[in-house]
Amino acid sequence: MKRALISVYDKQGIVEFARGLADLGVEIISTGGTYRTLQGAGIPVREVAEVAGFPEILDGRVKSLQPQIHAGILAMRANPTHMAQLAEHGIGLIDLVVVNLYPFRETVANPAVTLEEAIEKIDIGGPAMVRAAAKNYQDVGVVVNPARYPAVLAELRETGDLSLPTRFSLMLEAFQHTAAYDGAIAGWMATRGREIVATRALGETAPERPIGADPGPQKPAAPSPFPDVLSLTFTKVQELRYGENPHQAAAFYSDGSDGGTVIARAKQLHGKELSFNNINDAHAALELVKEFEEPAAVAIKHANPCGVAVAPTIAEAFRKAYEADTVSIFGGIVALNRPCDRETAEALSKIFLEIVIAPAFAPEALEVLTRKKNLRLLAVGPIDRNPPSGFDMKRVGGGLLVQSWDAIAEDPVAWKPVTKAAPTPEQLRDLAFAMKVCKHVKSNAIVVARDGQTLGVGAGQMNRIDAARFALRQAGEKARGAVLASDAFFPFPDVVEAAGEAGIAAIVQPGGSIRDEESIARADELGLAMVFTGVRHFRH
């Protein structure tokens, strides 16, 4: 190991690493800011421009893109022709490339970032050097991760070189690094970048033309939000003990996005390691509790809500959510949209739960809850009620289903009353509450609710009437005077009839069945109020 090229944006640990290389007699060449950092630390270093015989130009856009650099990286030591050509042109070998890239992902995490700012953080020379070194891994080491510095330096001190397995491992990490980098760029440009360009195009002022004149070529329709090639980049957060079942291997990955309230950025304060099912259920709980502005508590079991409630205080909201289904909550997950206080913690501690999620936990609440050594506590920070960034995706054999998130807000003002009886203001509030919950229940879904509390949840049934019967049976006598929400239309009036028999006072459903009139007529006969939303909420 005689010569190393170092060019890093993230300078964490680079001075110590470079000093270790210099102590081993390795010549160091470097670019721009890295050169100045190493020189300022008193480390012997030559500038790439000196080695290449060509200065940095275009405001630093061209620094290392030189044949004198890339030939020194790509030359195969065992190839006599390669070595002869290097000698002919006076090019020296480069044995180690240490590079990390401009922070594109961190830059575009800012929602206000401009297209120009994003473009300036697209690294060109760095990925080229990394790929060149990785391609020639049999002769060249490549380091893209500062966490690797100590191990690389230790091996060089011990043997004077890097073993083939080490270089192969570094090569693999390098290609993963550049693939993730390019994927992040392509993904952002295909979504937010495209939106910015489309907005600019729509904002252009059309030239004036005489009345009746040919308008000329028309602007194309807005482009699809779905790119022709979808590049996805995820970073492994942790290995999981197993998947949904013990015989399935599993891991958890993050997309690295910085905005919003999402489970991938929750901070675990206490308890056992999260499992695959824990994370899946925690995601379901968090996305549902984000629906509510008022204090709300959500209990989840197998990704379905079993108890949901809103109230003036978070302690009261949890009490109501627990009382909604005192059986199913056992071993479940609870999410709160307000910080957990001592009163709420005392109530939570009396039940066996897997996880409690909250924006934060008061010190006195932590004192209570941490007595349960296995209870996982997740803090998610102030609640951002927006959906996760990007797309909602589902893997299928040989492909990927991609859609926008079901993020439409429930707006009772826009709902259409279709029966002679209209819901009262109190019933309308409960209908809105019930529909927010119903949106997060596996289809076919029916929710019975009253006074900001679920009374019955019919989930995942193969026909709608069975979902309704389950929810109404769970509600029992409490169904009288309550409301009922359905995630999709009624194909027959049977759900209306079952609701009427149970004493339901008002119904909300999307409408859209060819038999809507039959359901409306039956509701009128039973004296029920019913409104149509026009929006279906299937969930599978």
Swiss-Prot record:
Pathway: Purine metabolism; IMP biosynthesis via de novo pathway; 5-formamido-1-(5-phospho-D-ribosyl)imidazole-4-carboxamide from 5-amino-1-(5-phospho-D-ribosyl)imidazole-4-carboxamide (10-formyl THF route): step 1/1; Purine metabolism; IMP biosynthesis via de novo pathway; IMP from 5-formamido-1-(5-phospho-D-ribosyl)imidazole-4-carboxamide: step 1/1
PROSITE patterns, alphabetized: MGS
Gene3D superfamilies, per the entry: 3.40.140.20, Methylglyoxal synthase-like domain
PANTHER family: BIFUNCTIONAL PURINE BIOSYNTHESIS PROTEIN ATIC, BIFUNCTIONAL PURINE BIOSYNTHESIS PROTEIN PURH
GO-annotated cellular components: cytosol
Assigned protein family: Belongs to the PurH family.
Domain MGS-like: 1-144
Swiss-Prot/TrEMBL keywords: Hydrolase, Multifunctional enzyme, Purine biosynthesis, Transferase
Protein name: Bifunctional purine biosynthesis protein PurH
This protein's record includes keyword Signal: no
Catalytic activity, as annotated: (6R)-10-formyltetrahydrofolate + 5-amino-1-(5-phospho-beta-D-ribosyl)imidazole-4-carboxamide = 5-formamido-1-(5-phospho-D-ribosyl)imidazole-4-carboxamide + (6S)-5,6,7,8-tetrahydrofolate; IMP + H2O = 5-formamido-1-(5-phospho-D-ribosyl)imidazole-4-carboxamide
Lineage: Bacteria, Bacillati, Bacillota, Clostridia, Eubacteriales
